[in-house]
Structure formats: C-alpha cells, structure tokens
Amino acid sequence: GDEGGLKINKLGTKEWLKTKAKVKKNLREVAKELIELYAKREKAQGYAFPKDTPWQTQFEDSFPYQETDDQLRCIDEVKKDMEMDKPMDRLLCGDVGYGKTEVAIRAAFKAVMGGKQVAYLAPTTVLAEQQYKEFKDRMNNFGVKVEVLNRFRTPKQQKEIIKRLKLGEVDIIVGTHRILSEDVEFKDL
C-alpha cells in the first residue's frame, strides 16, 4: 500500500544520495533553528519570584497528605526555577494520582505571593471544575481569589470574571482553552 508518499531507495544509487543530501540539509536547518531558539531563551529575562514567605510554609503545611520524595523534589526544583530571573522551561509528568496538582498549587501560591496572577489551563471542562474546587479549597484560608472560566459559566458570569481578572481582583484563573481567548486579559500575569 501507499506509505504516505515514502519511497524506498536502493543504497548507493543516485536517488539514495539525493535523498540523503536533502535530509542532511533539513537536519542542519532544524539544528540552526534550535540553536537560535536556545540562544534567545538564554538571553530572555524572566521574573524572579522572592524566596518563600512564612505564609508559603504555612500554606504547604496545610496539605492534608504526606508528600512523596519525588513530589518534594519537584516542588523544590519548580520553586528554585521560579526564583531565577530566567523564564522557567519545565515539564512535569506523572501518572494520575501522583501529586502533580499539588506541585502546581504550590507554584501558583508562590506566584500570587510574589504579586502575580496565575492562569491554570485544564484540558476538559470537568477537569477544570475539579481543579478549580481543589485550588479554591486549598487557597480559601489564605485570601487568594480563585475563579474558573469555562462553558459551565453563563456569558454574564464569564464577562464579570474577565472584568475582575483584568482589574487584578482574581489571583488565579482555572479554565479550559477559554482562558486563551482574546477577550481574556490579565492585570499582571
């Protein structure tokens, strides 16, 4: 069958040498783009968040479960990244139920304590609602204002949340791709 336009060449033929040269050229272009991207990242200035406050410690102590060693290591690494004046470039991966949300919650709290707003993107409306409740429950005693933006909110509610977000009256917004819409503006993300 047709393999999507792939063509097999016999080694050593003119077609093989031509294909090999084309691939080498493309690889050089990709390598050049990657080098330029990493150079740009290296020069980029980020926002250096302050060291943990006593409230951060109190907030973290309010976690009702025992953290795993991996969770504690990830939390420490993320917070160290946040305290650097370079944009963070980190991907956190883990199976369901292994504490990724708590890592995000602590980073979000640190960001809010550092005077910034936080946008937390969830892949589904149901997950956005669950994460919103978890963020809200964890932040409730610390005066952090958390809202959710998704299709479960009426257009009127969405408009009000967006207005408050732009005014800086919302610290953390949890939502689906809706939070990426052009009408969603932040005071200081």
What do these predicted regions represent?
Residues 83-94, 102, 115-117, 170:
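Pre-Walker A (Motif I) flank of P-loop NTPase domains
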